[in-house]
Amino acid sequence: MNHKDPLVSWNVFGLDVVFNLSSIMMLIITAVIVFVIAIICTRNLKKRPTGKQNFIEWVFDFVRGIIESNMAWSKGGQFHFLAVTLIFFIFVSNMLGLPFQLISGHTLWWKSPTADATVTLTLSTLIILLTHFYGVRMKGTKGYFQNYTKPIFLLPINIFEEFTSTLTLGLRLYGNIFAGELLLGLLAGLVTGDSTRAWGWIIGLPGLVVWQGFSIFIGTIQAYIFVMLSMVYMSHKVQDSH
């Protein structure tokens, strides 16, 4: 389990900027998979949907329900495609590391990109920044920042809340996916390790199968939670009351 990430460091204006090549590769693969799913499911659309069109319409309806549970559709409708893209992207990201891990030497190349805290915190930061952008856009600068100063003594708490929202949104996703893959690796080690003792197979193989199924469930739930909380934070910024 002593695997390392393929890191590359570049010096930019005197600062060392580190990139994880594995995470970058997996993010690109995730984006390609989501794009292919979208193309396949939206080709040759019909008035009476069947098969893949039924699936994509169900996803859109499901995500619409998430949005409408947090804000009026007149305001939340513009975030429909954002939320659908998020739920697909995070779900696929969560699933990629479950079937197997690709290791060259001691370098881990294939894993779920959401098992990297940098990736999940970047996603959560982008979501929080988007909530501020749309808050200012829909309320105006003055109306938006009044939410932070009414009453004035809550200003420090409101500012602190922005940081905690970013951290909890990103770290919740990272913690669940990373822990799941870590345990999968341990169970796989019992089955494929150097030891040929029967107990390794007896414990490891059933545990691996059960935990694979549980990890699929957790990955699905985490995609839902991330999108739900994103829309909750968005509604706080664009609704008339904070």
Swiss-Prot record:
Key word Lyase present: no
One term under GO cellular component: proton-transporting ATP synthase complex
GO molecular function: proton-transporting ATP synthase activity, rotational mechanism
Pfam families documented for this protein: ATP-synt_A
Matches recorded under InterPro entries: ATP_syn_F0_a_bact/chloroplast, ATP_synth_F0_asu, ATP_synth_F0_asu_AS, F0_ATP_A_sf
GO biological process: proton motive force-driven plasma membrane ATP synthesis
UniProt-annotated location(s): Cell membrane
Main subcellular location: membrane
Tree of life domain: Bacteria
Transmembrane parts of this sequence: 21-41, 79-99, 116-136, 173-193, 198-218
Topology of this chain in the membrane: Multi-pass membrane protein
UniProtKB keywords: ATP synthesis, Cell membrane, CF(0), Hydrogen ion transport, Ion transport, Membrane, Transmembrane, Transmembrane helix, Transport
Subunit structure: F-type ATPases have 2 components, CF(1) - the catalytic core - and CF(0) - the membrane proton channel. CF(1) has five subunits: alpha(3), beta(3), gamma(1), delta(1), epsilon(1). CF(0) has three main subunits: a(1), b(2) and c(9-12). The alpha and beta chains form an alternating ring which encloses part of the gamma chain. CF(1) is attached to CF(0) by a central stalk formed by the gamma and epsilon chains, while a peripheral stalk is formed by the delta and b chains.
Known role: Key component of the proton channel; it plays a direct role in the translocation of protons across the membrane.
Protein family according to the UniProt entry: Belongs to the ATPase A chain family.
Protein name: ATP synthase subunit a
